[in-house]
């Protein structure tokens, strides 16, 4: 990664500088007992540092959603899969929400993918879709959001930040379950 290539948008001279800064910013927010959902491209720049990066992060519970640069982690027999609590292409989770900051309690569903989708499972039930890949160039629609680090000054998002964004966003019924929609 250099100033000469297309991915110099993050203003680092080397991939090493970039990765060191990401690790520093993640560790400043994500604590040992937190749960981190990483939405892909863990091994951008090559597979040589997969284990090294994982060891430098304080968080013990990291779930990886495969991105287009994670081909060294994808194979079922990859030794790198052991670095993560789980690895998959998409993940749907229901999280217990008990947040004084957001004023919400109960459960909230999330559809996690490296790629942004127009529709996703249970969107008509209020499930929030979180994605990366597009480096902030693909605006969310309805209850979807690009949570890639490019959209948050190279920091991960807290759950409360995401919930706050969708506090007043109505549930989207535009899919095959609503026959009255054009």
Predicted feature descriptions by range:
Residues 1-97:
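Core catalytic region of metal-dependent phosphoesterases/phosphodiesterases
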Residues 1-17, 32, 154-182:
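Acidic, histidine-bearing metal-coordination/catalytic regions of metal-dependent phosphoesterases
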């Amino acid at each position: 990664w250099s100033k000469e290539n297309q991915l110099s948008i993050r203003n680092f001279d080397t991939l090493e500088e970039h990765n060191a800064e990401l690790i520093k910013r993640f560790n400043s927010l994500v604590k040992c007992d937190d749960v981190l959902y990483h939405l892909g491209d863990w091994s951008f720049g090559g597979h040589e540092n997969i284990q090294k990066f994982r060891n430098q992060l304080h968080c013990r519970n990291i779930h990886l959603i495969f991105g287009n640069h994670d081909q060294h982690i994808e194979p079922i027999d990859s030794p790198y899969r052991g670095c993560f609590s789980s690895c998959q292409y998409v993940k749907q989770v229901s999280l217990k929400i008990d947040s004084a900051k957001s004023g919400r309690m109960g459960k909230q569903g999330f559809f996690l993918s490296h790629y942004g989708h127009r529709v996703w499972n249970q969107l008509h039930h209020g499930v929030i879709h979180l994605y990366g890949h597009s480096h902030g160039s693909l605006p969310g629609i309805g209850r979807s959001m690009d949570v890639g680090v490019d959209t948050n000054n190279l920091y991960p998002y807290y759950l409360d930040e995401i919930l706050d964004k969708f506090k007043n966003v109505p549930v989207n019924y535009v899919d095959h379950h609503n026959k009255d929609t054009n």
